[in-house]
From Swiss-Prot:
InterPro entries: Ribosomal_bS6 (IPR000529), Ribosomal_bS6_sf (IPR035980), Ribosomal_S6_plastid/chlpt (IPR020814), Transl_elong_EF1B/ribsomal_bS6 (IPR014717). GO terms for cellular component: cytoplasm; ribonucleoprotein complex; ribosome. This is Small ribosomal subunit protein bS6. PANTHER family: MITOCHONDRIAL 28S RIBOSOMAL PROTEIN S6, SMALL RIBOSOMAL SUBUNIT PROTEIN BS6M. It comes from Azobacteroides pseudotrichonymphae genomovar. CFP2. The keyword Transmembrane does not apply.
């Protein structure tokens, strides 16, 4: 099993309820495939670097999880099919990045 990180941007026209519902949909896909969700972060509404589908802002989310590589194609297919997702990026964390992510999570816990 490998560690993965998925960052995705949702369209800004969604209500808070729709945003939570969409994020839970992707988390449910991971859980159904027996992935272990390590961390999730809501980065909130942020300005995009360039317009995407005539939108200049979007809701950013990060999911860190541990799973087999077979789940990635299923998750990315769902990202592509969902019209609420503007962009997404999923990648495998290497050893150095895993250490960095752990330090970042610990720092976030300390600030809360």
């Amino acid at each position: 099993m490998n560690n993965y990180e998925a960052v995705f941007i949702l369209t800004p026209v969604l209500s808070d309820e729709q945003v939570k519902e969409t994020v839970n949909k992707f988390k449910d896909i991971l859980i159904a495939e027996e992935a272990e969700i390590i961390n999730e972060e809501n980065w909130g509404l942020r300005k995009l670097s360039y317009p995407i589908q005539r939108k200049t802002t979007g809701f950013y989310f990060l999911l860190e999880f541990k799973s087999d590589s077979t789940i990635i194609s299923k998750l990315e297919t769902q990202f592509r099919r969902d019209e609420k997702v503007l962009r997404f990026l999923t990648f495998r964390q290497n050893k150095v990045f895993m250490e960095y992510a752990l330090k970042r999570r610990n720092k976030l816990k300390e600030t809360k």
